[in-house]
Amino acid sequence: MRNDYKIILELIPENSKVLDIGCSDGELISLLAEKNISAQGVELSQEKVISCLGKGLDVIHGDINLIVEDFPYNQFDYCILTQTIQAVQKPDVLLNTLKKVSKNIIIGFNNSARLSKTIKFLLSGSFDSLLKKSNSDQWYNTDYIHPCSIKDFKKLSLDLNFKIVSTYDVINAIQFNNGKIPSNLFCKEVLFHLTNE
């Protein structure tokens, strides 16, 4: 099981209602269901939606920016975006929209400012060397359109009037509280728990 999923499963209490945005193959939705958590997904890939529906998972096909606007206020206890925020057209607009859907938002992403990535870029001189998905991904055709650092995301969260409840260094499974954040230079993957209360 992915480390970020382990952390998310610990964060979300039983009987919660969850929206998993960019749910991919539905693995997290399945894990949440095992914990008696009602989870629904939104996914852009029709192929992945069909796969999820074949597993009996509640997943909607479509653009998250459009679908989320149609949900009623506070329909969910938690909204989750893992490895999704850097692929949406306007992350700030999406986060503001999510405020009406849920009081808690959990967001995970790869830290683009970590030292190893910076060195890799300096040595190669190519953004293509920083892409992790597939060999066919190039800087001009990747879904990864908004690289950001931990500091960038913290600033965005505060600018949008979110409270940072906690942050996690996902790889090392270390939790940070009271506004502290993992190291921008050394943390590879981070998870933020935000609230708009």
Identify the function of each model-found stretch.
Residues 1-15:
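Conserved alpha-helix/loop element of class I SAM-dependent methyltransferases that forms part
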Residues 22-24:
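Class I SAM-dependent methyltransferase "Motif I" SAM/SAH-binding loop
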Residues 27-66:
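Class I SAM-dependent methyltransferase SAM/SAH-binding core
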Residues 67-73:
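Short conserved loop adjoining the S-adenosyl-L-methionine
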Residues 80-90:
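A short SAM/SAH-binding and catalytic strip from SAM-dependent methyltransferases
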Residues 89-100, 104-197:
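S-adenosyl-L-methionine-dependent methyltransferase catalytic module, highlighting the catalytic core
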